[in-house]
């Protein structure tokens, strides 16, 4: 091997080592919050010609959040607290969530729950939640005003209607 080839090989190896060190350093300096996104931004990124979309909560919020709950208008503050959800970032009027407000709550076993306020003009989940709660009540079951939870591996179906993503399943 010529002297030029040896020097070129040494430079390439040195550059490779520096790149690997930078990658290692950047991965160790990452923020501890592994939250990958939120429901609103995930649905907003869907192509305009897509009218139906299925998402998995774990794909939206990350594997660390194995369940998602929805807080809808009329839900009582004491019932939300019973579900061990910090109500600091949730708006209540007269002890209940007011009309026009809804929230998605990503639940983690090891991290603080992530609360996302949903804009009902962009993402509507409460119509479906209300229908499911009424169906449960007709069968003699009750949430007793609590927060409905969905496992992170259970798909959530959404359909776009007039620019609003509505949960349909």
Question: Whereabouts are the PLM-identified features?
Answer:
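N-terminal export/targeting and maturation segments
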Residues: 2-83
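Generic alpha-helical propensity signal that fires on short helical segments
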Residues: 19, 83-88, 130-131, 136
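Aromatic-enriched hydrophobic runs in primary sequence
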Residues: 7-11, 65, 74-78, 114-115, ...
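Generic serine detector
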Residues: 26-27, 40-41, 102, 108-110, ...
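Mature extracytoplasmic domains of secretory-pathway proteins
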Residues: 57-126
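C-terminal partner/receptor-binding element of secreted or periplasmic proteins
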Residues: 125-169
């Amino acid at each position: 091997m010529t002297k030029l080839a040896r020097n070129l090989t040494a430079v390439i190896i040195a550059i490779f080592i520096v790149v690997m060190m930078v990658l290692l350093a950047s991965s160790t300096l990452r923020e501890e919050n592994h939250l990958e996104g939120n429901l609103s931004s995930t649905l907003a990124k869907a192509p305009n010609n897509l009218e139906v979309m299925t998402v998995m909560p774990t794909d939206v919020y990350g594997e660390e959040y194995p369940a998602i709950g929805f807080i809808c208008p009329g839900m009582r503050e004491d019932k939300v607290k019973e579900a061990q959800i910090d109500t600091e970032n949730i708006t209540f009027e007269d002890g209940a969530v007011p009309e026009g407000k809804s929230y998605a709550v990503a639940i983690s076993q090891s991290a603080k729950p992530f609360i996302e306020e949903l804009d009902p003009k962009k993402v509507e989940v409460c119509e479906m939640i209300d229908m499911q709660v009424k169906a449960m009540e007709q069968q003699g079951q009750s949430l007793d005003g609590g927060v409905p939870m969905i496992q992170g591996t259970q798909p959530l179906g959404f359909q776009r209607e007039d620019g609003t993503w509505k949960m349909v399943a």
